[in-house]
Amino acid sequence: MGAGDLLGLGVDLGSSGLRLALVGADGHSLAERSSAYPRPFEDPEGWRQGLATLVTALPQHLRQRIGAIAIAGTSGILLRCSADGAPRGLALSYATACPEQIPTLAALVPEGGPAASASGSLARALRLWGSFPQALNPSQDLLRHQADWLMGWLLADWRWGEEANNLRLGWDQQQQRWAGSIAAQPWAQALPELVAGGTGLGPLAAAVAASLGLPPSCQVVAGSTDGNAIVLAAAPGPGDGVAVLGTTLVLKQFSPQPLAGAGVSNHRLGGQWLVGGASNGGAGVLRQFFSNEQLEQLSRQIDPNRPSGLALRPLPGRGERFPIDDPELAPVLGPRPVSDALYLQALLEGLTELERLGWQKLQELGAPAVQRVLSVGGGANNPQWRLLRQRSLQIPVLNRAKASAAAAMGRWALASIGWEQPAPPEIRHE
């Protein structure tokens, strides 16, 4: 089989389900699959079972052409596992804030960094360290994020982690080391050995390759976060920002320099800094009140030029990461008007205000002013929401609902074949 016949398998572990895409040498998808997690989102076995089910459902003749696989994981999902990958309980969600860890965080890492927040992965790691009857044993226990744990299953080797997934755990991408005094802690051995996204880590474990029906030569490539993957899929140009309208609201843009601020992430990608933040609010809050069918029907009744007059803060629960870093910030979901369409409009306006504050926050910290917003994710299918956002932001807002994070990871994986340490794919400018 020639190199041009090989396919890249990209996996997107979203907060609402799994997606995968098979990508050919021309960059186009040959097949895409998606499903909900077969277990609760925080159960790691559900990630593994869901991936195995989707992969084995692909036609065998296509599976035999897969040359590399890369995974984008939901940023901030952290679990404790044994050295051979066995989960020791459920993972802690990205929305889990740990305000009781603030004094310890202050002693470990510099103030204002991504790991200094009570909503960051380092705070969750500290809670995992102290919340089990048997203390964390660094020689027998590991702390891994979602994508890194699943990557370990593919390799039957859980020592690796990918940089972007570990920034809020305390990895300093500029200095290429753990921030503050993290490396001096007795539990530092439980942290992963980090590599850059796009790095080839070796072939699939033989047993995994056999169970999935994949070639034993298939390479496992370090992926990225789901937010970074969807930015690659959206292909932003100069001056563009990318808003991911999924279960949560994620904002990303390119900046000539990294930013310093609570709740803000900085990723080195394609020779630039991809900066941004993720709110706990998003379309997931809408689903607390409406089905997808209701959302579609009620949205048609919204007049974007007539404000609802309500001021809601659509958070799924207490605590926020970005644009406000406050583990005690409470949602505001009422008063609820009689009209369901008006209530939906008010919720969308509340999410729009979170977005406006987010872009404003990034600019205050030193990012260039966004001139245009590209919208991806499920919310990018809603034209009324787009108009509400465009009116609030006072800049063009375009919907790119077909952008696929899984396909972006497939292209990322395919680009790695033949290189020992492949560079991340270039960002395409339009």
Predicted segment positions?
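N-terminal glycine/serine-rich phosphate-binding loop of ATP-dependent small-molecule kinases
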Residues: 1-91, 134, 139, 210, ...
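Active-site core segments that coordinate phosphate-bearing ligands/cofactors
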Residues: 9-10, 106-118, 126-140, 144-145, ...
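Short beta-strand to alpha-helix junction loop
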Residues: 43, 174, 197-201
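Short beta-strand-loop/turn "lid" adjacent to the catalytic site in phosphate-handling enzymes
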Residues: 60-95, 112-119, 137, 147, ...
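Pocket-flanking alpha-helical
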Residues: 77, 100-104, 231
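Short, conserved acidic/polar surface loops in the N-terminal third of protein domains
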Residues: 79-84, 103-106, 254
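Short alpha-helix plus adjacent loop in nuclease-associated cores
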Residues: 94-110
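Intrinsically disordered, low-complexity regions enriched in Pro/Ser/Thr/Gly and acidic residues
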Residues: 186-188
